[in-house]
């Protein structure tokens, strides 16, 4: 009528149509009417936005775990430590959003951390050390959809402040380390159709303990146990298809393992410099430097993970909530080496690898260099 038509190809969407958690297509039915229909799969932004909670909490845990309880060289003085760490982090495909698992992801991170002791004293047969640290870092993670296609990339700029309290029983060597940390996250999730930004706060508390045993004069074995509880709150926002809301995220971790390493006296001693004034502070050969090494295998169990992401529009009944699980078990191996290069300066390097063996726990690798200066 009046030149109108309903033939195939008469209508088409000029650009992808998204609303809430779905993509929509324009279809012509047998009755020659045209309808908007949602696709079976969720739009790519669903796994992309849900992974923001996981990425931020993974970073917070790695940052807190980069601090060794051994806050001084032989524990004799206050010290300042500068650490630089970088590595890979990600999660395997365990069924994705459709099965309630964390989306598959893979990316990198890096941070610079400055830490300093504020107080070191002896109390009732205990050595007590307190201090603070600050860190600035960045992570970038590529996220995949349930079908293995690219969902997008999440970038996070993070600034952190933390404090620690270390107690060591003087006679037995039994120690406990308490850490409290807060992080400000500024995140951007980019897909083919959207750029979504969210800011938020992450918090973390950790209690770690260990008891060293001497196997030989220079070899030590130290069983360790650590409990970590962390949380994250991200601001709600909106993208081109509707609102995006985040529920408070939290998760808990238990790490059980041991550290095996040398326990040599790190006294600098007299060097081989031909100048008398340098013999107590300079070495000519690397073989003369006091060195300790260590390896630390662990099992990490992640449990009680929570964190919702909701998407929808103003239309009634459009809201959908996704709660991917981060529970699982991973095996972790860290190894390190430290050398005293001056009377008051120690250099350390370490590397590690974590592998998920069940569930949606994180996996990745890391490398770190640390400069420790006592005063």
Q: Model features per residue range: what roles?
A:
Residues 1-38:
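Extracellular, surface-exposed repeat/solenoid domains
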Residues 9-11, 93-94, 306:
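Short conserved micro-motifs at the rims of enzyme active sites and ligand-binding pockets
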Residues 12, 23-27, 35, 106, ...:
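Ser/Thr- (and often Asn-) enriched beta-sheet segments in non-cytosolic proteins
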Residues 37-224, 229, 235-237, 325, ...:
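Outer membrane beta-barrel translocator domains of Type V secretion systems
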Residues 122, 159-162, 247-375:
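Outer membrane beta-barrel transmembrane domains
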Residues 235-248:
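Acidic, Ser/Thr-rich low-complexity linear motifs
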């Amino acid at each position: 009528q009046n030149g109108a038509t309903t033939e195939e190809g008469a209508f088409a969407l000029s650009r992808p149509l998204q609303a809430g958690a779905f993509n929509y297509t324009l279809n012509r039915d047998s009755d020659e009417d045209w309808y908007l229909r949602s696709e079976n799969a969720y739009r790519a932004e669903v796994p992309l936005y849900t992974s923001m909670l996981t990425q931020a909490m993974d970073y917070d845990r790695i940052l807190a775990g980069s601090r060794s309880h051994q806050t001084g060289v032989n524990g004799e003085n206050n010290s300042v430590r500068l650490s630089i760490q970088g590595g890979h982090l990600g999660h395997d495909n365990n069924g994705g959003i459709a099965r309630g698992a964390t989306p598959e992801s893979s990316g990198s991170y890096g941070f610079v951390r400055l830490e300093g002791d504020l107080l070191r004293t002896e109390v009732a047969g205990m050595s007590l050390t307190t201090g603070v640290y600050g860190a600035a870092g960045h992570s970038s993670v590529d996220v995949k959809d349930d079908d293995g296609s690219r969902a997008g990339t999440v970038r996070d700029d993070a600034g952190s402040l933390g404090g620690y309290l270390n107690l060591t029983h003087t006679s037995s060597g039994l120690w406990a380390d308490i850490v409290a940390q807060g992080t400000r996250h500024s995140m951007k999730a980019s897909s083919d159709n959207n750029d979504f930004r969210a800011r938020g706060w992450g918090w973390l508390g950790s209690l770690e303990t260990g008891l060293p045993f001497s196997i030989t004069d220079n070899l030590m074995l130290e069983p360790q146990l650590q409990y970590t509880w962390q949380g994250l709150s991200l601001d709600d926002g909106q993208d081109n298809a509707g609102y995006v809301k985040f529920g408070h995220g939290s998760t808990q971790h238990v790490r059980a393992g041991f550290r095996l390493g040398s326990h040599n006296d790190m006294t600098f001693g007299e060097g081989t410099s031909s100048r008398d004034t340098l013999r107590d502070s300079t070495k000519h050969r690397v073989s003369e430097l006091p060195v300790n090494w260590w390896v630390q295998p662990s099992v990490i169990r992640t449990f009680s993970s929570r964190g919702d992401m909701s998407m929808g529009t103003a239309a009634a009944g459009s809201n959908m909530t996704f709660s991917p699980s981060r529970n699982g078990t991973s095996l972790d191996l860290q190894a390190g080496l430290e050398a005293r290069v001056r009377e008051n300066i120690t250099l350390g390097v370490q590397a590690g690898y974590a592998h998920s063996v069940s569930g949606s726990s994180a996996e990745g690798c890391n490398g770190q260099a640390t400069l420790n200066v006592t005063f």
